[in-house]
């Protein structure tokens, strides 16, 4: 289906059983270096360490995108504040950090704004 839309999909497996042998972030780095013109937007979800690496790559390369967060959301409506994540204004690096509720403002955020800890 992706090919019908002109989108290339690539597969990465840690053990090399299919597609790229290695972490998906090493494949992402390869694509950013070899085909920067194709890197128009990045959508990320997965384990936090992987998302942090992908986020850094996207931000360093100036690739816009979105990041989908999972978190403990006891109330699910933003009252308990258990799911807050720090955010920054990428256009004003000296500006203060603020916190957003994943269950209320997310779970999808601008890839440049969320601080993954």
Q: What do these predicted ranges mean?
A:
Residues 1-117:
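Reductase modules of NAD(P)H-dependent flavoproteins
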